[in-house]
Amino acid sequence: MEDLVQDGVASPATPGTGKSKLETLPKEDLIKFAKKQMMLIQKAKSRCTELEKEIEELRSKPVTEGTGDIIKALTERLDALLLEKAETEQQCLSLKKENIKMKQEVEDSVTKMGDAHKELEQSHINYVKEIENLKNELMAVRSKYSEDKANLQKQLEEAMNTQLELSEQLKFQNNSEDNVKKLQEEIEKIRPGFEEQILYLQKQLDATTDEKKETVTQLQNIIEANSQHYQKNINSLQEELLQLKAIHQEEVKELMCQIEASAKEHEAEINKLNELKENLVKQCEASEKNIQKKYECELENLRKATSNANQDNQICSILLQENTFVEQVVNEKVKHLEDTLKELESQHSILKDEVTYMNNLKLKLEMDAQHIKDEFFHEREDLEFKINELLLAKEEQGCVIEKLKSELAGLNKQFCYTVEQHNREVQSLKEQHQKEISELNETFLSDSEKEKLTLMFEIQGLKEQCENLQQEKQEAILNYESLREIMEILQTELGESAGKISQEFESMKQQQASDVHELQQKLRTAFTEKDALLETVNRLQGENEKLLSQQELVPELENTIKNLQEKNGVYLLSLSQRDTMLKELEGKINSLTEEKDDFINKLKNSHEEMDNFHKKCEREERLILELGKKVEQTIQYNSELEQKVNELTGGLEETLKEKDQNDQKLEKLMVQMKVLSEDKEVLSAEVKSLYEENNKLSSEKKQLSRDLEVFLSQKEDVILKEHITQLEKKLQLMVEEQDNLNKLLENEQVQKLFVKTQLYGFLKEMGSEVSEDSEEKDVVNVLQAVGESLAKINEEKCNLAFQRDEKVLELEKEIKCLQEESVVQCEELKSLLRDYEQEKVLLRKELEEIQSEKEALQSDLLEMKNANEKTRLENQNLLIQVEEVSQTCSKSEIHNEKEKCFIKEHENLKPLLEQKELRDRRAELILLKDSLAKSPSVKNDPLSSVKELEEKIENLEKECKEKEEKINKIKLVAVKAKKELDSSRKETQTVKEELESLRSEKDQLSASMRDLIQGAESYKNLLLEYEKQSEQLDVEKERANNFEHRIEDLTRQLRNSTLQCETINSDNEDLLARIETLQSNAKLLEVQILEVQRAKAMVDKELEAEKLQKEQKIKEHATTVNELEELQVQLQKQKKQLQKTMQELELVKKDAQQTTLMNMEIADYERLMKELNQKLTNKNNKIEDLEQEIKIQKQKQETLQEEITSLQSSVQQYEEKNTKIKQLLVKTKKELADSKQAETDHLILQASLKGELEASQQQVEVYKIQLAEITSEKHKIHEHLKTSAEQHQRTLSAYQQRVTALQEECRAAKAEQATVTSEFESYKVRVHNVLKQQKNKSMSQAETEGAKQEREHLEMLIDQLKIKLQDSQNNLQINVSELQTLQSEHDTLLERHNKMLQETVSKEAELREKLCSIQSENMMMKSEHTQTVSQLTSQNEVLRNSFRDQVRHLQEEHRKTVETLQQQLSKMEAQLFQLKNEPTTRSPVSSQQSLKNLRERRNTDLPLLDMHTVTREEGEGMETTDTESVSSASTYTQSLEQLLNSPETKLEPPLWHAEFTKEELVQKLSSTTKSADHLNGLLRETEATNAILMEQIKLLKSEIRRLERNQEREKSAANLEYLKNVLLQFIFLKPGSERERLLPVINTMLQLSPEEKGKLAAVAQGEEENASRSSGWASYLHSWSGLR
């Protein structure tokens, strides 16, 4: 069917039709084209995803990377994109070249397709013959197949019902497992007992903490005593600090004055720059033409401004002589500005180039659009011209009708022959089916149980897989939800940016969808055509049935056919004339085909041009997409800048908060300094350090003044960097101080001298210069100085924060300006996009119009074709009629002309004869006169001469009378000829009427021919369906067998596994319960230890966390500084692009105005310092409390460690028990491995069964091959018959033509003979008369020269007439002999024809009888099949009921065991609670005994399942030592009792209500272990026996297969000649596909084993092992039947 579908798909692409190029391509090329498009779409998608990922990375990147790096990255990206663009253009060019090559290849393939199409038509004729033979087979097999299918479906439904019931049972078991889980949850509720123990331990910890607190209070008293001693020294130091503070304030005021002066100068510079920038903005907005000129002016203005700035800076340097570094800074600034200007110029040039590039692209696109429009109009005109040419191509189908007429006669004969063959094949198939059904019934009964077992095992495996999959599904759902949340967040962020891309992508998708939709519509049309053909096939089948009913009218029709055949002989002459006409028409057709090929080439060219147009459209769309992406990138860039600004503001707020925290820490440090001021030695060291710090502060003050001047010359970025670096250093120093102070608190009593050195270090780090001589001064003055320096630093920090805020405001303004400009650019780009979209819409509309016009043209073409076909048919009919009429007319005219010629000859002869007679008479009179004048002797005898004259006169009179009579006769002949003419005319009219009747009959015959052809096509389709359904039947039979085997195996495996699982589960549950109790106890103890350790670790971590927080804050501060630096660098570039200088000047003005606010902020900062000092004191108190808690927790830890040691001893005991349990688990694993071996054996059995199935399939293939041979022979006979019949018909027609021609010649010869004889007789009479006259008249003078001449002429005529007579007589004899031979041949042919008719009638009768008998047999088979199905269903129901009873029994037993386990668990929980309440001082021996008791009790309580319990009947119970379990009457219970030798096997009430003794538990344990060992031994024995039996089964099966193969070989021994030919062909052929085709034949003949097959296949492949192999018997059919 696939081949036919492909043919049907390829057929529309004939040269006559003008369809698109995609339709002309084959299916594989179309698929490749679609794949290429999908790859391009995927590439675009991947590119989009990569861009989105990069956007997300840029967003997720910290602000530290800076906008400068981003700009660099973006520029690099831009360059990369431009390179990619160039590469894509090159790829486009290469793709164009490839496309051109592909088109050429397509054209070549079209030509090849044409040749292949011709070959296909030839093969199609051969296939039609085969299909007609196989048609009847299909009908019978279809009915059988439908019945078998219905039965198999019923069986499948029953199997599915059984599986559903089993799944319900498994659900019930899952519910029971859920109950076990609930019991485990109840066990966890026991934990409150352990929690009470934890509370007891916590009380002990509280006691230890109280003790630690007492020691801490003692230490605090000692510290207070020391602090009072140090306070005096601190007071002296504070006074000195106040003095230094006053000096420092004066210096700060002087620096502030200098800063204000420099700020005013800077404002003036900024104003100038702002004016310049405004001018630049106005010039840019004016027009794009004057950009370059104005840009140069701006550069000159900027340079002047920079020179002015340099002059101002020089003036400042004169004013501020102390600042030597100002000039260098100004130069650096100028260089920096020049660099930024160059960068701006480069960016500006890049933007200009892009704008020009876009304009050029737009112009090119417009030109392309116009060019495409012009091309389209030209193409339209060409198409209109070509339509006219296509109309001429419609005359091709005339030849097809004549071919079909010739095929009709052959089809009728083949139909009868196929009916006979079908009946024979049906009988053979019935016998085969009966054998197969009997074999299937036997195998089904034996294999049903095996397959049930296998199905049960598979069901269990599938359920486990289901549970795993559900868990995985839940995990996947959770992951999916988390991912979905993340994706929603990302989608909200990327919604605006990806909106336009998605819209454009959707438009592309819609275009592709429309293309796909068009292709689908074309496919649908193809399928509709296919459906229409199927409908015609059905209709032909109905007409075929009608034809069968009309066969009764055959004898009557045969009589008419005979009559018609006689008439056809007359018309065969006209056919010869038609042949000449046909040759002329064929010459015309050839010329038309050439014109058609030219037209097709032109169409191809037009399609190529259309493809180019589409590509240009796609390029335009890509450019639009790129522009849209650029717009989106600019928008994204602006949004990123806004985010960065927001992040900067957040970072500044965080830094301020960190400063507050640092201030608080400083206050705490000040408090600590007061505490430590009691030591005099420390104070003296501190005073020195303070003096040093004062000196450092003065140096720092000078450096700050210089830094301020540099700050004024440089940009705000440099100031921020310097201050931030200073703040970082100070923060680091503060962190170090905190660490030192913590160490001092711990080692205060031991290391007083170390504290002094730390204070000196602290003061040095603060920057104050304190001399060693000032140790004796008050410490208070030193502290005051330190406080003042800190206050100044805080004020500076506030100033810096204020300045940062101002810079942030400036940045926000700049960002707004950038946004406005970006909005303007976006609007421009949007306008461009709108223009492109409008152009795109116009182009689409034009395309739609073109397509609509194309469709209209195609519809017009179809209409014209239909009209042309109709007219052509009418013309042909008219030509046939005209030719027939012309032939009849020509015949009648020939006849009339002959008659007219005959009449004219008679009329011409009359005057000639009369003239001759007159001449003769005149001559005679002249002679008489001469004789009278000359001879005087005549006078003497007057009487004698008178008498002679009288006699002559009488003779003459007689002759005249005779002539008159002849003339009358001639007149009568003329009258008769006229009458014959009238009669011939009447006959022509009757012939015309007969011609019309023959034409009507001919039309009827052509209609019947068409019906027969359609019937043949339907028969073809039916045969294909039959092949498909037979293959499906085989597949479904195989499936049914496989399912049955699987069901048996699964049921067996289920039984075995259920027995094993029940025993293993019981043991495992006991072990798991014990392990869980031990683990829970151990875990609880470990949890307690871990909690104590965690509490300790938490305290340590809190201390470390504070240190880490300090370090993190310092690092964060450093990162923020770096981020600020990078952002400022980027902002400088952007400011220069958007005339940054104006805003900088305005900001400087604002700075000058806001100097008054600085003092207010300094006051706020001092307040914050005080609050921070208070917070520091609070934190110190908290640290002391925490240290006390640490001591308490250490004591608790010691107590817990003692408890841990006791618990570890108990854990070791539990571990010993666990090892024993593990040994038991190892044993169970071994048993599971044995069961897996049994499963592998089952799988081997399945493989052997599959081998048997393959053997049966091979038999089927052998039968198919035999069928193919018979069909090929039949086809050969049919062809031979056909050729012989056609030869006979040709010879008949030739002989008939010759007979007619000879008859006409004979008639003509007879007519000529009659005329010649009459003329001869007349001449004879004349000659005699002349002789008589000469004899009578002995006058020599009478013999004149005239008489001699007439005599010679007459003699010549006589000779000629004699020759003609002889020729005509010879011809007559030849014609008579030929006529006789032809008549004899005609008689023999008629006899043969009659015999054939009689034989066909007899064969039809026989076939009908056979059909009736087959139908009766079929009914019998159906009844037998239904009986077998009912028997099988009843057996299946019985098995199902028994299985259900077994499952119910197992469920009841399971429920009982669960109830007993629940009761035991409740008891165990109570006992555990009692054991926990008992003191821990109990000896380990008692604990071991209690555990053993528990284990033994658990072993005795749980029922032990035997492997043989499942196979027992319903009345029997399980083999257990439990008191509740029913006593079994089987032999296995007795063997266990003998092994155990214990009196406790009797039925007793449940023992777990009372507490068991140690001895009872030991006895029960020993009994259970013995029973388990006994069961293991039995299992091993049964497995060993099973393995031996499986090996025996394998051997037996292999022997059975070998014997079966021998029997099948004996069958094929009858056809040894065929086997010899096949083997010879296999040996002499080269290794490859041809050898592989012979493999199934050799396999079926010799019945090879799978190993032998493999070897033969390897030999057949040879070097071409990897080549493709043909499958099935159909591939061999072609090579065998000779139908390649």
UniProtKB/Swiss-Prot annotation:
User: Where in the cell is the protein located?
Assistant: Cytoplasm; Golgi apparatus, trans-Golgi network membrane
According to the entry, every stretch annotated as the GRIP domain falls at 1609-1659
Compositional bias of kind Polar residues:
1477-1492
The record's region (Mediates interaction with RAB9A) falls at: 1574-1684
Q: Acetylation among the record's keywords?
A: yes
| Annotated segments matching region Mediates interaction with RAB6A | 1574-1613
Region annotated Disordered sits at 1-22, 1475-1502
Q: Which GO terms describe its molecular function?
A: identical protein binding; small GTPase binding
Mark the residues carrying the PTM Phosphothreonine: T14
Q: Which residues carry this modification: N-acetylmethionine?
A: M1
Where on the chain is Phosphoserine found, per UniProt? Answer: S11, S236, S1483, S1487
GO BP annotations, alphabetical order: Golgi ribbon formation; late endosome to Golgi transport; microtubule anchoring; microtubule organizing center organization; protein localization to Golgi apparatus; protein targeting to lysosome; recycling endosome to Golgi transport; regulation of protein exit from endoplasmic reticulum
Q: Which GO terms describe its cellular component?
A: cytosol; Golgi apparatus; membrane; nucleoplasm; trans-Golgi network
Could you say which tissues express the protein in this record? Ubiquitous.
> Whom does it interact with, and what assembly results?
Homodimer. Interacts (via GRIP domain) with RAB6A (preferentially in its GTP-bound form). May interact (RAB6A-dependent) with ARL1; according to PubMed:19703403, RAB6A and ARL1 are not involved in GCC2 Golgi localization as proposed by PubMed:18243103. Interacts (probably via GRIP domain) with RAB9A (preferentially in its GTP-bound form). Interacts with CLASP1 and CLASP2; recruits both proteins to membranes of the TGN. Interacts with STX16.
Its function? Golgin which probably tethers transport vesicles to the trans-Golgi network (TGN) and regulates vesicular transport between the endosomes and the Golgi. As a RAB9A effector it is involved in recycling of the mannose 6-phosphate receptor from the late endosomes to the TGN. May also play a role in transport between the recycling endosomes and the Golgi. Required for maintenance of the Golgi structure, it is involved in the biogenesis of noncentrosomal, Golgi-associated microtubules through recruitment of CLASP1 and CLASP2.
- Any notes on this protein's domains? Extended rod-like protein with coiled-coil domains.
- The protein's name is GRIP and coiled-coil domain-containing protein 2
The species this protein was found in: Homo sapiens
